Amino acid sequence: MELYKKGYSARTIAKILGCSKSTVCYRLYKLGITPRRGLDLNPQEIIKLYQNGYTTTEIAKIMKCSHETIRRILRNNNIDIRKSSESLIIKNTKKINLNPSESLAYILGVLNGDGSVNKQESNYVIELKVTDKDFIEEFKRNLENIGFKYINEYVRKFENKKDQYVVRVRSKGFYYWYKSLNVDYYMNVIGNNEKLMISWLKGFYDSEGSVVINKKGNYVYKYVSIANTNRNLIDVCCSFLEKLGIEYSVYCEKNNRYKSGYL
């Protein structure tokens, strides 16, 4: 009876016990249990698929049975059913490409600036909130390029302020990978490829950059400025600019906000 509750078919139980299928069915009838018809499912295979990240719906399609049948087999084998948010995290994590690429470098540049990567209760959230629609669309496009398929995008409306565009994805794998990065990764991985450096600078500038115009007498000075309070990031920025042959200068304001201005 325990084997049957766990999802094993009468035929499989007969093989395990070394008896005939009819004997198993007879014993089930004696216990007041009507044998299931038309299914010969392997609970261990179902459990393995589930633990490898497949959803109950995906497993049901593979096994050609109902979604509820898979859930029942998992519950009867003491397997906790994941919440939909947890399934979403696994789906995103399985398909994300974290190998160095222009899209990944751009994403890192953004996250080093306005973006955020945080753990919110049981969720691992990558998020960007900005008022520039083109910026948010570019960030979203690059997320899709590295494999994010389930992207939450919405607009926050305010009475006396500009609309705020928000893009949010969830990924436990990306969260822990991102938190493990240090300056060496930027210097030795991104910093050894011209296209990657340009992509990172683009993302960092989209987050932290601005065009400054100063007038002094008859002269007009125009330059690009990137401001950030993290000196390590400014050092990375300066290293990339130097490798790309772009002149720059660095100074620190009284409030310890570092700026990298370059022509």
UniProtKB/Swiss-Prot annotation:
InterPro entries: Homeodomain-like_sf (IPR009057), Homing_endonucl (IPR027434), Intein_endonuc_central (IPR004042), LAGLIDADG_dom (IPR004860), Resolvase_HTH_dom (IPR006120). Gene3D superfamilies: Homeodomain-like (1.10.10.60), Homing endonucleases (3.10.28.10). Residues 107-246 form the DOD-type homing endonuclease domain. One of its GO terms (molecular function) is DNA strand exchange activity. This is Uncharacterized protein MJ0314. It comes from Methanocaldococcus jannaschii (strain ATCC 43067 / DSM 2661 / JAL-1 / JCM 10045 / NBRC 100440). The lineage of its organism: Archaea, Methanobacteriati, Methanobacteriota, Methanomada group, Methanococci.
